Amino acid sequence: MPWIRNFGSIVATISVSIGAVHAQSVKLTIPTLPAPSLGAFMGPVIKAEKFDEQNGLDLTFVQKPTATYRTDFAAGTDQLGGSGTLLADVALLRDKGLNVVYLFNVFDFWATVVVPQGSDVKTVTDLKGKTLAASLPTASFPMFRYLAKLGGLDMDTVQLRNSDSSGLVPMAKSGRADAVQLWEPSYSILIHGNNDFRSIDVMSKWKETTGYNAFPYLGISAQQAWVDQNKAIIPKLFAAYEKAADFIKTNPQRAAALIAKDLGVAEPVIQELIASDRLQLNLYWASANRAASEEVFKAAKSVGYLKSMPSESILYDPAK
């Protein structure tokens, strides 16, 4: 029958069109640090809501141990970094002569110090002479060190105890240190369902000192050679992340369910984190907050984390 033949032709046309769309999708692998980490937050939302496909991409998110993640990116084995901190994964590598770029920011910096509820530590200066557990090699610690210095604390007066980042929450619970320096999502995991800890403010010093709300910290990093060859793809990657960020803000319960399942964290923990001001989900092109990034570099240099100020080409500008 003619109508059957026509119907079959329509179905075939649709199938070919859909197949063509998928065939044109650009495949990218995005390595991230292992869960629970901020770098692993966006992948579950992007994939579940197909924000990559909507932008002509087929993204694969791969979690790697911290040492492997950093080694593979520094060696150029990985062209992109989904847990790219502005300092550890871009500026520090530039300091060492590697040509890498910060494409766009996803999360601004947030950190704190936690002490037991009954502790006599009330402000950051009270840490003098105390034992502080922290993950010293991370990008979080030098920025905390800088903020603590602004708050009047000489870190040389503190007994530092180094710990792997995964060991900080158990360290806080055990009471083996007077205080523990944390960031998200570890802080939310620690305080969920209890009132055993207090947070010591250090974040207010950033705006007081610099005048900026933005505090560039973690986003997408890339090898410059990859950037040069894939400039048409980069706006699509940004758009996929932008859609995910908007979704998290407008659909927090659905987003929390997706993220919690993938990260292996209790859903109420993620719900509370999204509702708080601590997540600091703030998406922007690296060049959009150049002045704030320069303040980050100056801060890192002042505490000895960076040897020199990186050139402005470290911050990707989509207009160039």
Write out the residue ranges for each language-model feature.
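Short, surface-exposed acidic
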Residues: 155-158, 263-275, 307-313
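Sec/Tat signal peptide C-region and signal peptidase I cleavage site
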Residues: 18-23
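Short, solvent-exposed loop/beta-turn-alpha elements that line the ligand-binding surface or hinge
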Residues: 53-54, 204-213, 280-288
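Bacterial N-terminal signal peptides that target proteins for export
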Residues: 1-11
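Secondary-structure end/capping motifs
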Residues: 227-302
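Short, glycine-/small- and polar/acidic-enriched structural segments
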Residues: 24-164, 171, 178-184, 200
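Pocket-lining segment of extracytoplasmic ligand-binding domains
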Residues: 166-259
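Conserved C-terminal helix/tail region of periplasmic/extracytoplasmic solute-binding proteins
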Residues: 297-320
